[in-house]
Amino acid sequence: MSPILTNRQAEELHKSIIAYLTANNLLNTANTLRAELNLSENAFDTATAKKYETLLEKKWTSVVRLQKKIMDLESRMSALQTELDNATPISLAKRNKDPASWIPTAPARHALESHRDTINSVAFHPIFSSIASGSDDCTIKIWDWELGELERTIKGHTRAVVDVDFGGPRGGILLASCSSDLSIKLWDPANEYKNIRTLLGHDHSVSAVRFIPLGASGAPSSGNLLVSASRDKSLKIWDVNTGYCVRTLQGHTAWVRDVYPSPDGRFLLSTGDDSTARLWDISVSNPESKVTMFGHDHFNECCALAPSSSYQYLSPLTGLKKPPAASSTAEFMATGSRDKTIKLWDARGTCLMTLVGHDNWIRALAFHPGGKYLFSVSDDRTLRCWDLSQEGKCIKVMRDAHERFITCLRWAPSIFKDTPTGHGAGDGRNGDSKKTEGPDVQIRCVIATGGVDMKLRIFAN
């Protein structure tokens, strides 16, 4: 008898094995085992065989499920232990007071519901407490993120609204949206979000839209130019005043999923289904892809340029003794892919590091305005924080941040007091200023996420 099992447990195991062998037509083996165990035919009749014939398989699958659950719990415990190790009472108190070190924590301040389908994108108003969300339900909704209230619903697109962004000329902030209906629309927040212009020219779904910053000294503000990315494999630059496409960038060989402008408006970072990221210098008359980054094993979903506040943490990875000047843009960047990884790159296209931890597609990235952290969201329903000062170590995992896939992430743009209409540099997806860059810059500790659960979640200090 096994020293681990009781007599009854051993008997059930023996009968289960015999029943399994019999059910799989291994009769000789079953009879031999029955004889070895001295089980008579009366002790193992038809009723007994029926009772035990699936028991072994059920117990086996139960063990496999239990093992997976144990592994998941061990992984979660390890992540929590890491977070605990990095969170002394002193460091927590300091982090909560210092915007440059603030990290979002659960629960969300607001979980806003009104959309009837997946939320694909979110964008903060650069001045007011308004936030826009675009959805597969073909609408854009404007919310007050401080009060957690719906302000209005904007209709106009005939298919899914894929991306939204605030920006525009100085003194005239606009909301831009793009859609699977092949169009880009401009809306005027000062006139009840009236549709003032529709931009047509792409031959397939438009997957991303961003205002291009002017890049003036001090706070970068958006100008008259807008960039869009499309499934037609191209990027287009538009003049929002005239509605004309002033430039088309060709180079990607498949769907372009995302685009991110540099704070000075000189560079664009794009990525997509050809598994590459491309850095474009649009300050020249005939821009071509300046650098092409290869390395991901699946389609790329998102990209982001690192703010200058991150240079001090990323420069050691390149062997530089001193970080590049803060005025130098597009020195470092990040890409997220369906291969479940995030890659960090330098301006030469060298992969500096691969961040592994997500269990599903990476859907959006956001650099902390303070420069120390990189945030990511994924179809694994988590929001993760990677510490760039610790060589990209994952220091926080917010599990079940949404009930289903998380599709978008955005950081509220910093406030530039001397330039109130500033869009916030490549707020692109997330904002990228740092309080220490100047006395007139204030980091807003607010992020928003959206997902397939049709909820817009606001995390704020």
UniProtKB/Swiss-Prot annotation:
<dbReference type="GO" id="GO:0051012">
    <property type="term" value="P:microtubule sliding"/>
</dbReference>
<dbReference type="InterPro" id="IPR001680">
    <property type="entry name" value="WD40_rpt"/>
</dbReference>
<dbReference type="InterPro" id="IPR056795">
    <property type="entry name" value="PAC1-like_LisH-like_dom"/>
</dbReference>
<dbReference type="GO" id="GO:1990234">
    <property type="term" value="C:transferase complex"/>
</dbReference>
<feature type="domain" description="LisH">
    <location>
        <begin position="9"/>
        <end position="41"/>
    </location>
</feature>
<keyword id="KW-0963">Cytoplasm</keyword>
<protein>
    <recommendedName>
        <fullName>Nuclear distribution protein PAC1</fullName>
    </recommendedName>
</protein>
<feature type="repeat" description="WD 2">
    <location>
        <begin position="157"/>
        <end position="197"/>
    </location>
</feature>
<keyword id="KW-0132">Cell division</keyword>
<keyword id="KW-0206">Cytoskeleton</keyword>
<dbReference type="Pfam" id="PF00400">
    <property type="entry name" value="WD40"/>
</dbReference>
<feature type="repeat" description="WD 4">
    <location>
        <begin position="251"/>
        <end position="290"/>
    </location>
</feature>
<feature type="repeat" description="WD 6">
    <location>
        <begin position="357"/>
        <end position="396"/>
    </location>
</feature>
<keyword id="KW-0813">Transport</keyword>
<dbReference type="InterPro" id="IPR017252">
    <property type="entry name" value="Dynein_regulator_LIS1"/>
</dbReference>
<feature type="repeat" description="WD 1">
    <location>
        <begin position="114"/>
        <end position="155"/>
    </location>
</feature>
<dbReference type="GO" id="GO:0000922">
    <property type="term" value="C:spindle pole"/>
</dbReference>
<dbReference type="InterPro" id="IPR020472">
    <property type="entry name" value="G-protein_beta_WD-40_rep"/>
</dbReference>
<dbReference type="GO" id="GO:0051301">
    <property type="term" value="P:cell division"/>
</dbReference>
<comment type="similarity">
    <text>Belongs to the WD repeat LIS1/nudF family.</text>
</comment>
<comment type="subunit">
    <text>Self-associates. Interacts with NDL1 and dynein.</text>
</comment>
<dbReference type="InterPro" id="IPR006594">
    <property type="entry name" value="LisH"/>
</dbReference>
<dbReference type="GO" id="GO:0005737">
    <property type="term" value="C:cytoplasm"/>
</dbReference>
<keyword id="KW-0853">WD repeat</keyword>
<keyword id="KW-0493">Microtubule</keyword>
<dbReference type="GO" id="GO:0005874">
    <property type="term" value="C:microtubule"/>
</dbReference>
<keyword id="KW-0131">Cell cycle</keyword>
<keyword id="KW-0498">Mitosis</keyword>
<dbReference type="InterPro" id="IPR036322">
    <property type="entry name" value="WD40_repeat_dom_sf"/>
</dbReference>
<keyword id="KW-0175">Coiled coil</keyword>
<dbReference type="InterPro" id="IPR015943">
    <property type="entry name" value="WD40/YVTN_repeat-like_dom_sf"/>
</dbReference>
<dbReference type="GO" id="GO:0000132">
    <property type="term" value="P:establishment of mitotic spindle orientation"/>
</dbReference>
<feature type="repeat" description="WD 7">
    <location>
        <begin position="401"/>
        <end position="457"/>
    </location>
</feature>
<dbReference type="InterPro" id="IPR037190">
    <property type="entry name" value="LIS1_N"/>
</dbReference>
<dbReference type="InterPro" id="IPR019775">
    <property type="entry name" value="WD40_repeat_CS"/>
</dbReference>
<dbReference type="GO" id="GO:0005875">
    <property type="term" value="C:microtubule associated complex"/>
</dbReference>
<feature type="repeat" description="WD 5">
    <location>
        <begin position="312"/>
        <end position="355"/>
    </location>
</feature>
<dbReference type="GO" id="GO:0070840">
    <property type="term" value="F:dynein complex binding"/>
</dbReference>
<feature type="repeat" description="WD 3">
    <location>
        <begin position="201"/>
        <end position="248"/>
    </location>
</feature>
<keyword id="KW-0677">Repeat</keyword>
<comment type="function">
    <text>Positively regulates the activity of the minus-end directed microtubule motor protein dynein. May enhance dynein-mediated microtubule sliding by targeting dynein to the microtubule plus end. Required for nuclear migration during vegetative growth as well as development. Required for retrograde early endosome (EE) transport from the hyphal tip. Required for localization of dynein to the mitotic spindle poles. Recruits additional proteins to the dynein complex at SPBs.</text>
</comment>
<dbReference type="Pfam" id="PF24951">
    <property type="entry name" value="LisH_PAC1"/>
</dbReference>
